[in-house]
Amino acid sequence: LYELREKMDAEYFNIHDGADEDEITILSQSAWYGGILRAVEGEAEPFYASWQAFGNLNPEDPDFWNQADRHFDLTWYTDYIIGESWMSNIDWPWNNIKIYRSDVTGNRWRYCLIDQELALQPNGWTDVYYDHIRFMLDQDPSIPHISVWLKGMQNNRFRNYFINRFADLMNSNYLFEHISAIEQNMFALTRDEMVNEYSRWGDPNNIPEQMMAFTGNHLTLQQQFQMRTEQVRNHIVSNLGLPNQVNLSLNVVPEGAGKIHISTITPDTYPWNGVYFNGVPVSITAEPAPGYYFSYWGNNGLIADTLNVQFLDTLNAETIDFTAYFGEEHVGTGQIAAGEDGFSLYPNPAGDVIYLSNLKHKEAVYTLYDMNGHLLKEGIIRETDTQTVINISNLTPSVYLMRVMDPTDGPVHLRFIKAADLH
C-alpha cells in the first residue's frame, strides 16, 4: 500500500496560508495513538475550551451562526463535513482527525480532510450506495468533531447552508468529469512504475495479472465516482425531509452579457445545469458584465419580482429555468425617447426631480430601481396626467432604472442618470 499525502505541519500552513509559525496550533487524533486528541504544535486545551463554549450555544438563537463561527470556521467546516460524507468515510469521526488554527484563521479551528483510503470501493469499508448522511445523524454528540454538525443542523441558517453548499459542490468540484480527471492523471503517473514495483515487491513471475488487478481497481474507483452523487442526493432528500430534487438551468441573454451567482458558486458558461433541493431557500443573483446592466428575469412561475436582481426563495418545482436578461449600457443625455412605448423621462441627466411623460394617457404604475435591482420608489401615473413629477433628491449620483407597468401592453423600461451637481 502506497499513500501520497501532504505533510500538514507548521511549515505547510506557513507556506500555503502565510501563517506565522509561532501562532500555529496543530492537533491530531488517531487510533495509532490511542484515539486521544494530542498536540502536534501548541496545546490541545484551547480546543476543548472552544468546544465547551460552542456546546453552550442555543441553535435556535438567530445569532447562532455568528457565535459558533467565532470558535469554528463554519464555511471551512461545512466543506470538510461534505468531503467526509461524499467520500463515505466511516473510519471517522473518532479517528483520522487533524485540526489547526493560526493568526490567519482568526484563531478559529479548521479541520483537514485526511486518510480516505478506506472510503468507497474497491478497498474501502463502504461503497457508492452507503448512506453517510444517516451515519452522521446517528453519531454520538459527545464526539467533538461531529457535534458541531449535529448541533448546527438544528439551526436553520446552518442547515440551509449545508444543503445548498453540498448541492453546489456536487454541481461543480464533485462533477464526475472533474474528479475522475484527477484520479485518471494519478493513475497514469503511477501505472508506468507498477511493473518495477511488482517485479521487486510482488510476484515477479506474474506481473501481467497484477497489472490487470491494478487497472481493475482504477476502473472500479472511477465507477464509484460516477455513481456516488446520485446516491448522495437521494440520501439528502430522504434523511433531511426534503420534498424533492430540482433540475435547474441558468441562462443569460445576450450571450456574454453577465453571469448568474447561485448559492456559493458562479458558473462560467451558459446555459448551465445543476441539481438543487426543494424545501430550502436558494439565492440566485444576476451579475452584469462591464458595459451591461441587469434588465429582468424571464418569467418562470417562481419569480415574484422579475426586476429584482436577486431571487431568494424555495425552488418549489421539479424542473425550473432562470434566464437573466441584460441590456447594453448606452445612457446618453437629453430626453429618453418615448417611441411606441408612450412614456419618456426628462431631463437626462437629472437633478433633484425627473419628469415622467405619459403620452398614452393611460393609468400605470411606476417603480424605480438602482442597478442592483433594489426597489427605491414607486407610484401611480394617473390617466389624466400627461406629466408626473418624481422627487429624486435623496438618490446618490448613479444610473437608475424606471419600470412603467402598462396594464394592457406590459412593462416599459427606461434608464436615466442622477447627476452629481447640475448647478
Q: Can you describe what each PLM-predicted range is?
A:
Residues L1, F13, E45-S249:
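Middle-to-C-terminal accessory/interaction subdomains
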Residues L1-G42:
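Conserved ATP-binding subdomain of kinase catalytic cores across diverse folds
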Residues Y198, G202, P281-L307:
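Surface-exposed interfaces of beta-sheet-rich extracellular modules
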Residues S238-N247, Y325-Y346, A420-H423:
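Residue-level detector of functionally pivotal "anchor" positions at catalytic/ligand-binding pockets or at interdomain
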Residues N244, L307-H330:
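Conserved "repeat-terminator" motif of extracellular CCP/Sushi domains
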Residues V246-P254, G258-I260, A324:
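A short, amphipathic beta-strand motif
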Residues S263-G291, N316:
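Extracellular modular ligand-binding repeats in secreted and cell-surface proteins
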Residues I336-Y346, A350-H423:
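C-terminal outer-membrane/trafficking sorting elements
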